[in-house]
Amino acid sequence: MSAPRTLYDKIWDDHLVDSQADGTCLLYIDRHLVHEVTSPQAFEGLRIAGRKVRAPEKTLAVVDHNVPTSPDRHLGIKNEESRIQVEALARNAADFGVEYYSESDKRQGIVHIVGPEQGFTLPGMTIVCGDSHTSTHGAFGALAHGIGTSEVEHVLATQTLIQKKAKNMLVRVDGQLPPGVTAKDIILAIIGEIGTAGGTGHVIEFAGEAIRSLSMEGRMTVCNMTIEGGARAGLIAPDETTFAYIEDRPRAPKGEAWDMAVEYWKTLHTDEGAHYDRVVVLDAANLPPIVSWGSSPEDVVSVQGVVPNPDEIPDETKRTSKWRALDYMGLKPGTRITDIAIDRVFIGSCTNGRIEDLRAVAKVVEGRKVAPTVSAMIVPGSGLVKEQAEVEGLDKIFREAGFDWREPGCSMCLAMNDDRLKPGERCASTSNRNFEGRQGFKGRTHLLSPAMAAAAAIAGHFVDIREWK
C-alpha cells in the first residue's frame, strides 16, 4: 500500500514526466495563461528559434496590466511602452494561433479572474503564468504558480517546466468567521502570523471549517496572496462548491466528460495521515477586520488596534526596516488605525475585483456619499464582472455614491498604467501589495477588504465595518 499523500503530492505525481537524482524534475503543464508584460521576449525567442507554440489550445492570452481603465480607452494607450507591449501580444497571439482577449472583448480582464470565469482553470491541473499571483487558481485544487519570462518561453515551446518539488505546509483555519470578517482578513492574518518569508520553499494547503465555508471567490482571494506569504503556490481541495462554480463554464467539460472529471476531482484531497513539513493553525472566531500599516503585507493589525512601535522588535535589522516603513507611510507608533485619514480608495485587482466583492461594496455605500476629501474608484476584474454588476444595478449605486466606475484591468494595483497615486497620497486598497511605490511614486498603500475600503471611502478614514450602520 502506498504512503498517504497530500493534495500537492498527488498533483505533482500526476504531472511528473522525469526526475533526476538531484531532485530536478520535469513537469507537464496543463494550462498556460499569458499577458502582455512577461510574454513579448518569450514569443520572440520562439520566433528566432523557428519554434511553434506546442499546445496553443492550452494557452490563453489576455491584456490586463497596461490597459487603461478609463471610459475612453478605445482611443488608445498613451504610454508608448505600454502600447508596444499590448500590440505585441495581439500580434504574437495571431502569429502563434493562441486565443486572445483584447480590451474590446467583453471576456477581457485580469488574467487570474478570466481563467476561472472561462472554465479554463480546473481542479488537478498544473497552471502557470508569467505573474506571481497565478497562485489564485489554487483555489480550485490546481497547482498554480508564477514563472519567469525564460520559463514562459520554455512552456510555450514544450508544455513542460523544469523545477524542484517544494515542501508541504498546512494552514488550517478552524471555526466560523465572525460577521464583518472576510477571506481578505483571513489571508492578511495568515501573512501577519507567518511573515512574508513564512512559506518560503513550501506549497501551502489551506483547510479547516472557515476555508470550506468560503465561496469560490473567497477562496480565490485567499490563494491569491499565498505568494505574499512567501510560498510558491496555495491549494484548496475541490468540493461541491468548486464543482458548482465550474459547471457550464465555456471551457468546462460537458456531458459524460463532466461526470468523469468530477469523479477524478473527488480524489483530489489529502489522505489521512499524510505528512506536512509545517502546520499553522488559526481560530477564525478570533480574527478581526484587518488593515495593513506598513510597506510589507506582513505589517498588519486589527482595525481596532494601533500602529505598533518598532522599538519593541528585538531583531535590529527588522526593527530598522519597520521604522523605515513608518517613515515612508507618514505614521507614528500608537496612532489608532481608525484615526488615519485617507485620500484615495481603490477597489479591484485580482485579489478583490469579482462580483461578490462588488456586491459587498454596494451594501456598504448604497444611499451614502464618498467623503469630499476622498477620490474613490471601482475597477471590475473583467468585462463579464462589469456586465453582471450593471445587470444588477451596482454601477448606479456606485456612481450615485460618488465612485468612479471603470473598465476592467489591473489598474491601480500597480503603477503600470494611468491609474496611480500621487506622491504622499494615502490609499485604502483591496489589492495585494503595499510595497513602496507599488501604486505610484511615494504613494502610501493600506491593504484591506472591499467592505472596509468602501466604508473608509464614505467616512474619510478607516472604520470598523462591524460597527457600520
Curated annotation (Swiss-Prot):
Keywords: 4Fe-4S, Amino-acid biosynthesis, Branched-chain amino acid biosynthesis, Iron, Iron-sulfur, Leucine biosynthesis, Lyase, Metal-binding
UniProt superkingdom: Bacteria
Cofactor requirements of the protein: [4Fe-4S] cluster
Pathway(s) where this gene product acts: Amino-acid biosynthesis; L-leucine biosynthesis; L-leucine from 3-methyl-2-oxobutanoate: step 2/4
Cofactor binding mode and count: Binds 1 [4Fe-4S] cluster per subunit.
Coiled-coil annotated spans: none
EC number(s) recorded for this UniProt protein: 4.2.1.33
Chain positions recorded as [4Fe-4S] cluster binding sites: 350, 410, 413
Reactions catalysed according to its record: (2R,3S)-3-isopropylmalate = (2S)-2-isopropylmalate
SUPFAM superfamilies from the UniProt entry: Aconitase iron-sulfur domain
A GO molecular-function annotation: 3-isopropylmalate dehydratase activity
Summary of subunit composition and partner proteins: Heterodimer of LeuC and LeuD.
Annotated family: Belongs to the aconitase/IPM isomerase family. LeuC type 1 subfamily.
Protein name: 3-isopropylmalate dehydratase large subunit
Lineage start: Bacteria, Pseudomonadati, Pseudomonadota, Alphaproteobacteria, Hyphomicrobiales
